[in-house]
Amino acid sequence: MDGERKIKIALTKGRIEKEAVKIFERAGVDCSEVINKGRKLIFHNMESNIDFVLVKAPDVLTYVEHGVVDIGIVGKDTLLEQDKNFYEVLDLGFGKCKFSLAGLKDSNFYSGYNRKKIATKYPNVARSYFRKLGQDVEIIKIEGSVELAPILGLADAIVDIVETGSTLKENGLVIYKDICSISARMVVNMASMKMKKEEIEKIINKVQVQINEIEKAVR
């Protein structure tokens, strides 16, 4: 489009990508190439002057921070875990879940004065939570099924993302405390927000309108 600068948007691969595409389509951006992507990772929309890039969640903020892309669509869990520089501009209202502290049903987690061991895929989130409580804990980073840690005696509890709670229940775990809510967010590179202010604000406004309409429809 004449006079408008190209905007590059990084989408988190998977469920967030699919939900984000629905909103962009509603906002008038043709995402047919992304929908029928095959093995492609980069998509050019000449009409809207937008490029979409598909990346894994932890990499979205890296691309945004370094200015390789202007906008990122990523879960709040990733924002909380990574210490990056960006503007968080929109709560997109999908991908809703929560960070929770959980452990064995019959455990006395809150009793005793021993230093508790906490297993998690999100050490920074867990560390921040217990720091606010003034509680000294040992954080153990886990890459796989974190539910195994208390079952096998590696940890006293876990900090993890919970959606329905069914996985916890099936493994004999219960939620001790909900830490915070999570959903998909739109973030913007700090320099891009200044250099491409008009183009980016146009996208933000279009997406915001669609979010508002979706929220009205489900009330």
From Swiss-Prot:
Its main location: cytoplasm. This is ATP phosphoribosyltransferase. It comes from Clostridium kluyveri (strain ATCC 8527 / DSM 555 / NBRC 12016 / NCIMB 10680 / K1). PROSITE patterns: ATP_P_PHORIBOSYLTR. Pfam families: HisG. Its EC number is 2.4.2.17. It catalyses: 1-(5-phospho-beta-D-ribosyl)-ATP + diphosphate = 5-phospho-alpha-D-ribose 1-diphosphate + ATP. It comes from the Bacteria. Belongs to the ATP phosphoribosyltransferase family. Short subfamily. HAMAP family: HisG_Short. Catalyzes the condensation of ATP and 5-phosphoribose 1-diphosphate to form N'-(5'-phosphoribosyl)-ATP (PR-ATP). Has a crucial role in the pathway because the rate of histidine biosynthesis seems to be controlled primarily by regulation of HisG enzymatic activity. One of its GO terms (molecular function) is ATP binding. InterPro entries: ATP_PRibTrfase_cat (IPR013820), ATP_PRibTrfase_CS (IPR018198), ATP_PRibTrfase_HisG (IPR001348), ATP_PRibTrfase_HisG_short (IPR024893). Keywords: Amino-acid biosynthesis, ATP-binding, Cytoplasm, Glycosyltransferase, Histidine biosynthesis, Nucleotide-binding, Transferase.
